[in-house]
């Protein structure tokens, strides 16, 4: 399904929504109804999540079309959310839902930028989009922000979710966390930074001299709103995590053995601020 979603322009809605249906079903149905079954299949689920992160990231790294690159990388992000759900911990599930929300914002921003480039150029082939930062500074800056958020750079909502996923999964299977973290970091950095270099930098070809940057409030406003939300939820993750953790606490089995547990500190809300004062994870 992920490979099909990554290929066609008609799957933009599916990229942002459809992949989350299965993960939402795991949280709402599989964990509450079959908690012991989830525990029995814990190793297999974590292995599948790790394979998704590494394989889809590797495939994204080999893409020569911006739409394909974004599509495959979005499937890899869902692997990180899957890892948080498979950890069967409140921290991990909260991080997984945060990743899903951040991915929805990032997918809208990324494919919106890709669609604008296609409207201007008629193609999203990366080798035909060199030097665009000179002609399209606004779109270029938004694309850099989208790529950095996709890499999991601190300050964006994706980082807040991914770090909670890694904390939640660490006590269960630390080697999976190490492999997943390094794999997502290295592979994601390679394809995102390579896309920034090939699309925005380098010489501007004669064919791209007539390209126009985004003009007018109606064109810029959607991109600005998505960028602001990604940064807002990255700097203040408690806007999401407090509500998510309070709801997820009713779904996670109370008898999770060997998974990360939350230790509330004083009267502060559970999770949220990524600091020892707000959350303590027992390793």
What is each stretch, according to the model?
Residues 1-16, 71-81, 106-188, 208-229:
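Interfacial and helix-entry/exit segments of alpha-helical transmembrane bundles
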Residues 3, 16, 21, 38-88:
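Internal transmembrane alpha-helices of multipass membrane proteins
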Residues 4-11, 28-37, 59-62:
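Short juxtamembrane and helix-loop transition motifs at transmembrane-helix boundaries
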Residues 6, 136-138, 192-283:
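Cytoplasmic/organellar membrane-interface segments at the starts of transmembrane helices
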Residues 20, 65, 75, 103, ...:
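Divalent metal-coordination and catalytic microenvironments
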Residues 23-27, 54-57, 111-114, 163, ...:
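Alpha-helical transmembrane segments of polytopic integral membrane proteins
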Residues 27-41, 81-99, 169-177:
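Helix-coil boundary and interhelical linker segments in multi-pass alpha-helical membrane proteins
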Residues 29, 33, 54-58, 81-85, ...:
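Alpha-helical transmembrane segments of multipass membrane proteins
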């Amino acid at each position: 399904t992920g490979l099909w979603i990554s290929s066609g322009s008609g799957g933009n809605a599916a990229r942002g929504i459809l992949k989350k249906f299965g993960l939402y079903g795991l949280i709402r149905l599989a964990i509450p109804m079959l908690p012991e079954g989830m525990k029995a299949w814990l190793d297999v689920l974590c292995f599948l999540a790790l394979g998704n992160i590494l394989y889809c990231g590797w495939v994204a790294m080999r893409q020569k079309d911006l739409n394909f690159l974004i599509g495959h990388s979005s499937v890899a992000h869902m692997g990180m959310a899957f890892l948080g759900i498979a950890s069967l911990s409140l921290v991990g599930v909260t991080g997984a839902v945060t990743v899903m929300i951040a991915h929805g914002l990032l997918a809208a921003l990324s494919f919106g930028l890709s669609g604008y480039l296609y409207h201007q150029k008629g193609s999203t082939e990366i080798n035909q989009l060199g030097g665009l930062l000179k002609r399209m500074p606004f779109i270029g800056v938004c694309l850099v922000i989208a790529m950095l958020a996709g890499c999991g750079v601190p300050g964006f909502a994706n980082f807040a979710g991914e770090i909670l996923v890694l904390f939640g999964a660490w006590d269960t299977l630390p080697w999976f966390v190490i492999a997943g973290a390094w794999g997502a970091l290295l592979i994601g950095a390679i394809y995102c930074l390579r896309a920034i270099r090939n699309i925005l930098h380098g010489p501007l070809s004669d064919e791209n001299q007539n390209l126009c940057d985004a003009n007018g409030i109606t064109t810029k406003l959607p991109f600005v709103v998505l960028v602001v939300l990604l940064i807002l939820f990255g700097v203040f993750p408690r806007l999401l995590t407090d509500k998510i953790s309070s709801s997820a606490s009713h779904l996670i089995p109370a008898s999770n053995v060997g998974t990360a547990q939350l230790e509330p500190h004083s009267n502060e809300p559970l999770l949220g601020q990524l600091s020892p004062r707000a959350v303590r994870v027992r390793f």
